[in-house]
Regions:
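Small-residue-centered hinge/linker elements
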Residues: 1-65, 74-80, 84-164
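Glycine-rich beta-to-alpha transition loops that act as phosphate-gripper elements at the mouths
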Residues: 70-76, 175-179
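Amphipathic alpha-helical substructures
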Residues: 166-185
Length: 186
C-alpha cells in the first residue's frame, strides 16, 4: 500500500505507516527468537518522511540479523527506498520497481475561488509565512524553495540507494530519474 506518515492518511486501509513499521522492525531486531527478517514490499511509494523512517529501521535491523526484501507487484519510489537498505532483494519478473525520484505539488484553486467570488485577506510575518497557500499560484521565490527541497530529497534518495546497494551515486543516477523497471530488468 501507500507509505504514509500516520494511520488513516491513505485512501485505503492497506497503508504502510512509517512509525508503525519502524516500531515493528525494532521489535524484530530485539527479539532473539527471530534469526532473519523477510520484508514483503508491495508499495508504489508515498511519503518521503515515512520512507526515510523505515529505511533507518531496516538499516538498524540488519546490524543484528539478515534482512531480505521480497518485492511483490510494486516496490517503486518509496517502496524501493525502504527496500534498498536490505541485505538481499528478490523481485518477481513482473514487479514494477525503481522510480527513484521525488516530486511535490500544491493545488492552486485560484481559478475556482475567482469563479465563485471567494476572496480572502492574508496577514503574515514574512514573505514565506503562507508558503503553500492554495488560494494563489506560487511566486518565483516559493518555486525555488520547493525545488531546492525536492532536489535535496532526491539527492538523499540517491545516496540511500547507493549506500544500500553498494554502488556509487553516479551509477544510481544512471538508472534513476524516476524510471520504472520490471523485476526482470532490474
Amino acid at each position: 500500500g501507500e507509505i504514509t506518515d500516520y494511520a488513516g492518511s491513505s485512501a485505503s486501509d492497506e497503508g504502510i505507516v512509517g512509525s508503525k513499521v519502524s516500531r515493528d522492525l525494532r521489535k524484530l531486531k530485539d527479539n532473539d527468537d527471530v534469526k532473519a527478517v523477510v520484508l514483503r514490499v508491495n508499495s508504489p511509494g508515498g511519503s518521503a518522511f515515512a520512507s526515510e523512517q523505515i529505511w533507518h529501521a531496516v538499516k538498524e535491523l540488519k546490524t543484528k540479523k539478515p534482512v531480505i526484501v521480497s518485492m511483490s507487484d510494486y516496490a517503486a519510489s518509496g517502496g524501493y527506498y525502504i527496500s534498498c537498505a536490505a541485505d538481499t532483494i528478490v523481485a518477481e519478473p513482473t514487479t514494477l520497481t525503481g522510480s527513484i525520484g521525488i516530486f511535490g505539488m500544491v493545488p492552486n484553486v485560484k481559478g475556482l475561488t475567482d469563479k465563485i467570488g471567494l476572496t480572502y485577506d492574508v496577514v503574515k510575518t514574512n514573505k514565506y509565512s503562507d508558503f503553500g497557500n492554495i488560494m494563489r499560484p506560487f511566486n518565483e521565490g516559493e518555486k525555488a524553495l520547493l525545488q531546492m527541497t525536492i532536489t535535496e530529497g532526491y539527492n538523499t534518495f540517491i545516496g540511500r540507494c547507493a549506500e544500500g546497494r553498494h554502488m556509487t551515486k553516479e551509477a544510481i543516477e544512471k538508472i534513476a530519474e524516476g524510471r520504472v523497471w520490471t523485476g526482470e530488468a532490474a
